[in-house]
Amino acid sequence: MASPGQESVHDLIVVGGGPAGVMAGLLFARAGCDVLVLEKHADFFRDFRGDTVHPSTMEILDQLGMLGRFLERPHNRLYEARGTISGKDYVLGDLRHLRTPAPFIAMMPQWDFLDFMRDEAEIYPGFALAMDSPVASFLEEKERVAGVRLKDGRELRARLTIAADGRSSLARTLLPVENLGAPMDVFWFRVP
């Protein structure tokens, strides 16, 4: 990555080092691209973001040849969803019948999952992850996004910029893009 005052050019910049951003970086680096993933936080260990890796995600990891290494990491397995209704316990869902390489939910904190994804992505020479690199704005040229400007003033250019910056997306705030919504939402809360 360039120093302040220097320009950096990449095939691809991904804004956001969460699961979607790191996975995008991994896939493009695997395809031979020069990829820079930018994460605003100094590390992945931050506020609660989730702790489940679902069978469909593990199926993708299997297709990429990564599932075995993923399952070597510490995790717990949830095969059933159970609930208590009017004092009686019920099995609400049983994943064991799924025709997938991992018919369970892997319970793993998101920061551990992101460490795994980063480790896998760093196998590819074109992958770089820059922590503590908050984006201030997007560089626009000829009606296209040409890169980003970091809060420290550095300008990083790319042939393609992907916004994977999550719920509080800077991209949706700064760029003239329409928010199409989502078919579902999740309500997160803390129990004291």
Annotate each language-model stretch with its function:
Residues 131-145:
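A conserved short coil-to-beta-strand element within the FAD-binding core of flavoproteins
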Residues 4-20:
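Beta1/beta-strand and adjacent pyrophosphate-binding region of the FAD-binding site
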Residues 29-49:
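Glycine-rich FAD pyrophosphate-binding loop
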Residues 54-120:
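Active-site-adjacent segment of FAD-dependent monooxygenases/related oxidoreductases
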Residues 110-111, 168-192:
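Central beta-strand plus flanking loop segment that forms part of the substrate or channel wall
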Residues 8-10, 151-160:
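Core beta-strand elements of the Rossmann-like FAD/NAD(P) dinucleotide-binding domain
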Residues 15, 155-166:
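Short hydrophobic core segments
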